[in-house]
Amino acid sequence: MFKRSLKVLLSNPPINRVKPSSTIIQPLSNTTTTTIINNNNITNFEKMTHKKSMTIDNICQNVRNAQYAVRGELVIRAEAISHQLQKQKTEGTKTLPFEEIVYCNIGNPQQLKQKPLTYFRQVVSLVECPDLLDNPYVEKIYPADVISRAKEILGSINNTTGAYSNSQGIGLVLRSVADFIERRDGHKSDPSEIFLTDGASVGVQRILKLLIKDRSDGILIPIPQYPLYSATIELYNGSQLGYLLNEEKGWSLEISQLEHSYNDAVSKGINPRALVIINPGNPTGQCLDRANMEEIVKFCLEKNVVLLADEVYQENVYVKESKPFISFKKVVKDMGGDYADLEMVSFHSVSKGFVGECGKRGGYMELNGVTQDVKAEIYKLASIGLCPNVIGQLVVDLMVRPPVAGEQSHDLYLKERDNIYESLKKRANLLTNALNNLEGVTCNPSEGAMYAFPQIRLPAKAVEYANSIGKAPDAYYCIQLLEATGICVVPGSGFGQKDGTWHFRTTFLPSEEAIEGVCKRIADFHQSFMNKYK
């Protein structure tokens, strides 16, 4: 090392005399070498110049091609503006016409100030810190049923949330989910057919991984659709087979569209493996009726495709009298015969409904008609991830087994649940009515879920300008909305839409106190935008 460093020093003589103290000597020529002389010890550091192993061109191109609009360009820009607002606040300046970003891009209730359910948080706090149960004041702070539930849960997990559970999930929670499904549907549910997951998304990803070998395997997805599906299909190198929902008929699902998409795929040599149904719809907010669901089940059996039932919004139904939520599990079992054994996977989550615990990442999937050898492969996929997070599993348990009549926490739980539900229903109507009052905008009622998906008829000049700068017209509209109002929504082009139409998706999750202001800001911006491009 000494000889090598000395050679470098001689080939790059210093300009100034070297002092005994540490001195950095810059070489005369423009080389990659810097020599440091420290107390007469010569060492050498060379800047390594080598070709990078990972480049944007040689990484998996499916990753590059996958798009997830819900957290795409608009959200990245919104976060940048949020930092700017924080800086403004610190410096006492004001350069933007708004004071905060309103994130209406994603169904994330607690981000927009929905309060968590008291019972859930009380139980989780005791489970996370079991020493509290030994505190002499615990019974004065926590209701008796909360203490009892926490002890029951702790007994099922060896008194700690810090250990891995079984890859399929905690036995206590699996049994609770099965009991919930039986109460809901009136049909038997087997805990061994249930897998707990980190939110419904992980379950969806695992099943799609199981189904897709290559581009010759296709998945039928609704258009518009939740981009989890399109992104995951692309990641796994499958083919997206879109079927159009009918906007003119309240985003209805027509079997003729399924037939068209199926036949088109087969003609191209693609094998449709599964049909995705999102009920209630995301981003469209429609609810299916039983007759339509039975048609879908018949289609799946006839075509031999797996039914993937995304039912995470089953508690978000605002037309319960005319279109109550019915699970596909109930439909196939009620139909009986071969239909009862239809290959199907149903998904549910703690992120939606009135629970809104998105950050806890809890969910489950139930298998129906799946063979034991295939189920073993699903278990293998779960095992590769070790286990779902334990707190998420416990929140699933609380969701499917809340306090019952006679328990101390029951009345407060009902009050909080009903207040959230009624408020969501009110906000859904308020937002859709406000959107329908805008020039060139039509919006179907939000029968369920957490979103409105209005169609916006943009002036020709706006469309031309957006195209000239390489933006989808609805994306350009949404960017301008964000820049002018601080309201972050998602362009319809991120979900898929009928050619020649433009939409955006917005949640109605801002609080009742805030939603009217959001509606007014959208209305003011929209009128200004339309006037500018007329």
Curated annotation (Swiss-Prot):
The EC number(s) this enzyme carries: 2.6.1.2
Span of chain positions assigned to the transit peptide in the UniProt entry: 1-18
Keywords, alphabetical: Aminotransferase, Mitochondrion, Pyridoxal phosphate, Transferase, Transit peptide
Residue numbers bearing the N6-(pyridoxal phosphate)lysine modification: K352
Gene3D superfamilies to which the protein is assigned, alphabetical: 1.10.287.1970, Aspartate Aminotransferase, domain 1, Type I PLP-dependent aspartate aminotransferase-like (Major domain)
Entry GO terms, CC: mitochondrial matrix
InterPro entries (alphabetical): ALAT1/2-like (IPR045088), Aminotransferase_I/II_large (IPR004839), PyrdxlP-dep_Trfase (IPR015424), PyrdxlP-dep_Trfase_major (IPR015421), PyrdxlP-dep_Trfase_small (IPR015422)
Pfam families in the record: Aminotran_1_2
Protein name as annotated: Probable alanine aminotransferase, mitochondrial
GO biological process: biosynthetic process; L-alanine catabolic process
Reaction(s) this enzyme catalyzes, per UniProt: L-alanine + 2-oxoglutarate = pyruvate + L-glutamate
Record's keyword annotation contains Transferase: yes
One of the record's GO molecular function terms: pyridoxal phosphate binding
Cofactor(s) the record lists: pyridoxal 5'-phosphate
Subcellular location, record wording: Mitochondrion matrix
Domain of life assignment: Eukaryota
Pathway the protein contributes to: Amino-acid degradation; L-alanine degradation via transaminase pathway; pyruvate from L-alanine: step 1/1
Mitochondrion in keyword set: yes
Subunit-level organization: Homodimer.
CDD domains with a match to the protein in the record: AAT_like
Main subcellular location of this protein, as a coarse class: mitochondrion
